Each structure stands twice: as C-alpha cells, then as structure tokens.
C-alpha cells in the first residue's frame, strides 16, 4: 500500500515537471526566475507541497505554480536579504519569528498595532513577509508555522485588508503546506465584518485553521513561556534589531577552534552522596576530568599541568528535571541554568541518556554560536549509557534569556562507525523525520550558591513555580492597571463632555429667559 502510494506520488511529480516545462516555461521563460525552474526539477518535496495543496490535481497545481513563480520573480524572492528591507521596518518589530506553539510549530508574529495602512510602503511590507517566510522555508523545509495575529491595542488606522489578503495568499499560493493555523488574539468588535471577508479568502477547508482567542483561550495553542505578558504569558522576550531574532541554530564555538586548557579542567562530581541533599565543593583529587580531549601530537607544558592541578573547580549543579524523548532522556528538561559572573559558576551541564538498543548520534546547536563552548557538541551515545555535555559562555560574554540550544538525535545502525567522518556522513544522509529535536532555553541565576544551598527537588520545583506565578500575576496586575487607566481616562472625557453640555444648556436657558423678559 505504502509502495503504491510512493509510486503514484512519483508519477504525479514527474508529470507536473514535464507539463510545466512544456506548457509554461517555453512560453513564459522570461517571467520566471531560472533558479526556481531549476529547483522545481530537483526538489521533490517542493513539487509535492504544491500537489498536496491542490489535492493532487495536476492542472490546478500547474496554475498555482505559474502564479507563484511569477510572483517570486516580481518580488525577487531569491535575492531578498536584510539590505532589501528598509531598516525602520526591521526595527519596528511588526513581523518576526519567535517561539513555538504547543505542537512545536514556529510562531510567525504579526503585531498589527505597528502597521499603518500606507500605499507608499505596502511593497516593502510585502517584501518583509516574503523575506521571513523564504528565510524560514530554506532552513525548515516543510515544517509549518503558526501565524499569530496580535490585534491588541489596534486602531482603525491599522486595518488593511489588502495586506491581510496578501498574507493569506502567501500560504494559499506561494508557500503551500506551511500554514498550521492562524491564531487571532483580542480582535476588536469593529473588525468582525472584516474577518468575515477573510474567511471567504481562505476557503471552506482552511477556515477551520482560524482560531479567535482572548487571553484565556490563547493558552490552548501556545504555552505561557512563549506568550508575552499582555497575553497572559511569561516570555521576557523584547523585540530588537539588529540582529534578526529567529532561532538560527548553528555550530557552537568549540567545533570551530581549539579547546583551551580552561575547558579541559572542567570536571564534575563523580560520586553522588546517599542520604545527602546538599551539593558540596570537593577537592580535585576526588573528581575526574570530564570529556578530556586526547591529542598525541599536542604537548602540554609542565607549568600548564601544574595550573590544572592547582585550579579549583566547582561542582556542577545536577539537573533536576528530565525530558523523556523516544531516543534520549535529556536533563534538564527545559532550561539551562547558568550562574552569574559574580558567583563564578558560569558553566552548566546537560545529561543525555540513551534509552534505545542502538547507538544514538547527537548534535548540539545554539542560536549564539560565538558565545558558547559545548563539549562534546557532535558525538554518539551507546545503548543505556549517559553522556555529560558541558556548556560554558566564552570569555566574558554574558548569557541571554533569548539564547536557545537545540539537541538533535538520531538512531544509528549497529554496523555504523562513530568516528568524526562517519558521523558527518550519517548526518548528511539521515532522513529529517528520523531526527529527534529538543530545545532548551537559557536562564541566569544571579545569586546562585550551590555549595551552601540545599537543593531538594520539591523545593526547587516549588520556587520555579512560585516565581512563574508571581511573574504571571504581575503581568495580569499591569494589564488590569492599564485597563483601569483607560477607564479613568474615559470617565474624565465623559465628565468633561457632560460639563460642556451643562454649560451649553445653562447658556441656552439664560438666553431664553433674557429674551422672554426683555
């Protein structure tokens, strides 16, 4: 059954390519970008995305390809970069990628209150949409996005139906299969009629993708960790440019250069005390070096060796939460906790445990590769074994809450080698749907003193929960305060209006009696 399906799909892809070349490219070669035509002949997934969106009807798919390719050349999609977009548009933060919904789809934010309808800038705004979508499509081929229409504090000047229609067309024609859903937050009543029109543009099948939400419902689709405070979330993210804010996971620093002696002295507590609930500093003689790099051609001077022995290394704080994935258990589950510069405990630990019967290859990527050293960042883990990964900020660079880490893992065949060359080849060939991914956020603990603090699981979780609750309550309090201020302003306005009407009425009555008795 699956084999027949694959054969039918291959036939449809082949027919689509052949007919598009014969019926469209010959007559309209100057209307298309040659790079798009070439990609159509090579990228099966791209062709399949158009076919799937048109229910495998080749005639409809060809029309869609024609419209899409003409638009791509008209707006120069393949050549779009940051310099193609006016800097003020990138700085204002009306459109950007940040965070994930509960299904793991990237969030495509559209902050409508920052948009002003203006025909002079509409082309630049369309290019901005295309820039972000093309940038995402090249990195995450086939992964859908969730569009977040944030309509809070939106005025009449921000309503631009042509711009909304363009966004809808992007997902209907230009980037098929990339739309997971459209979450519309805090829609003003005056836009009800407008979004009835939007439903007709989407078509009957895509209407179900529209999700109208308020502060209570939006958390059904996006966790509070990726929602801003005005949506009832706890995400501290503040948009700024430069740089671009999307999660661009890259190779960390340690794979691009030599590992210094400072990193080689990294060590961890080797024996867990039974019955003890405190983390203590232990001497270097009781610790074993972690992930020491072995190079027979590289000699270490006696002075450097003495420095290693004399240096005092603090014990790592043991991660207390675990993400249980199908290939690896990853600890911590969600956040990497770094100590402050003052505390001197800037390093943190990621523990990977292989829960399969085969070797699992893993890679670690980060959105800030120039800031972190990761050891090891590309290796493998034997069945049932655990690997400790040391993450440390490079030099004096500070940890940011916007930084992210991505753990990628895939199961290897038993006959596969685990050397650097074999791992490189393995990652080139492994299908994307076989790769497990897990993301970790960064958090700085300003006054962390794990040598003297008692770290009980329950107390630790309680403090995390309490902190999150306080942050959530504070954001709700600020939102209530803002609404109260708005109500006070409206009351003052009505009071002034009433006073003016009273004065006007008094003047009218006075004039009436004056004329009556004079």
From Swiss-Prot:
The record marks 374 as: Required for FFAT motif binding. Residues 327-445 form the MSP domain. Keywords: Chemotaxis, Endoplasmic reticulum, Membrane, Transmembrane, Transmembrane helix. The keyword NADP does not apply. One of its GO terms (cellular component) is membrane. Residues 365-366 are annotated as: Required for FFAT motif binding and phosphorylated FFAT motif binding. GO terms for molecular function: FFAT motif binding. Residues 252-308 are annotated as: Disordered. Changing residue 406 to D: Prevents binding to the FFAT motif of target proteins STARD3, STARD3NL, RMDN3, OSBPL1A and CERT1 and impairs recruitment to interorganelle membrane contacts. Residues 1-496 are cytoplasmic. The chain crosses the membrane at residues 497-518. It is found in: Endoplasmic reticulum membrane. Residues 82-239 form the CRAL-TRIO domain. Its main location: endoplasmic reticulum. It is a single-pass type IV membrane protein. The MSP domain is required for binding to the FFAT motif of target proteins. Endoplasmic reticulum-anchored protein that mediates the formation of contact sites between the endoplasmic (ER) and endosomes, mitochondria or Golgi through interaction with conventional- and phosphorylated-FFAT-containing organelle-bound proteins. In addition, forms endoplasmic reticulum (ER)-lipid droplets (LDs) contacts through a direct protein-membrane interaction and participates in LDs homeostasis. The attachment mechanism involves an amphipathic helix that has an affinity for lipid packing defects present at the surface of LDs. This is Motile sperm domain-containing protein 2. It comes from Homo sapiens.
């Amino acid at each position: 059954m699956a084999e027949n399906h694959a054969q039918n799909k291959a036939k449809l892809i082949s027919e689509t390519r052949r007919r598009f070349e014969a019926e469209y490219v010959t007559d309209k070669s100057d209307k298309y970008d040659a790079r798009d035509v070439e990609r159509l002949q090579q990228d099966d997934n791209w062709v399949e995305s158009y076919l799937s969106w048109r229910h495998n009807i080749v005639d409809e798919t060809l029309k869609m390809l024609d419209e899409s390719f003409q638009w791509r050349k008209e707006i120069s999609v393949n050549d779009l970069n940051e310099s193609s977009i006016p800097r003020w548009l990138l700085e204002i933060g009306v459109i950007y990628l940040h965070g994930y919904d509960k299904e793991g789809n990237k969030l495509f934010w559209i902050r409508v209150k920052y948009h002003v309808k203006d025909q002079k800038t509409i082309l630049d705004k369309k290019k901005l949409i295309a820039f972000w979508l093309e940038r995402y499509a090249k990195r995450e081929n086939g992964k859908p996005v969730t569009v977040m229409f944030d309509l809070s504090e939106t005025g009449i000047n921000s309503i631009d139906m042509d711009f909304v229609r363009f966004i809808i067309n992007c997902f209907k024609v230009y980037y098929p299969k990339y739309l997971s859903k459209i979450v519309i937050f805090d829609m003003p009543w005056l836009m009800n009629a407008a979004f009835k029109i939007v439903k007709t543009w989407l078509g009957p099948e895509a209407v179900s993708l529209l999700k109208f939400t308020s502060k209570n419902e939006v958390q059904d689709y996006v966790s509070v960790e990726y929602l801003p405070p005005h949506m009832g979330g706890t995400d501290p993210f503040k948009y700024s440019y430069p740089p671009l804010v999307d999660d661009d996971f890259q190779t960390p620093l340690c794979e691009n250069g030599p590992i210094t002696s400072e990193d080689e002295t990294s060590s961890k507590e080797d024996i867990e005390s039974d019955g003890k609930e405190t983390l203590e500093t232990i001497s270097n003689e009781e610790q074993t070096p972690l992930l020491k790099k072995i190079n027979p051609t590289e000699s270490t001077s006696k002075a450097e060796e003495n420095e290693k022995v004399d240096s005092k290394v603090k014990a790592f704080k043991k991660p207390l939460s675990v993400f249980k994935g199908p290939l690896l258990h990853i600890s911590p589950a969600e956040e990497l906790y770094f100590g402050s510069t003052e505390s001197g405990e800037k390093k943190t630990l990621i523990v990977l445990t292989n829960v399969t019967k085969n070797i699992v290859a893993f890679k670690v990527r980060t959105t800030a590769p120039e800031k972190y050293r990761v050891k090891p960042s590309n290796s493998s883990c034997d069945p049932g074994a655990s690997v400790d990964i040391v993450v440390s900020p490079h030099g004096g660079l500070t940890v940011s809450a916007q930084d992210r880490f991505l753990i990628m893992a895939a199961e290897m065949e038993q006959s596969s080698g685990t050397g650097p060359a074999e791992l490189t080849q393995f990652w080139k060939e492994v299908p994307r749907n076989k790769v497990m991914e897990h993301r970790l956020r960064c958090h700085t603990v300003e006054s962390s003193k794990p040598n003297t603090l008692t770290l009980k699981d329950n107390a630790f979780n309680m403090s995390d929960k309490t902190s999150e609750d306080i942050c959530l309550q504070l954001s709700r309090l600020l939102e209530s305060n803002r609404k109260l201020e708005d109500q006070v302003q409206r009351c003052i306005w009505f009071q002034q209006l009433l006073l003016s009407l009273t004065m006007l009425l008094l003047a009218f009555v006075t004039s009436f009696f004056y004329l009556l008795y004079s």
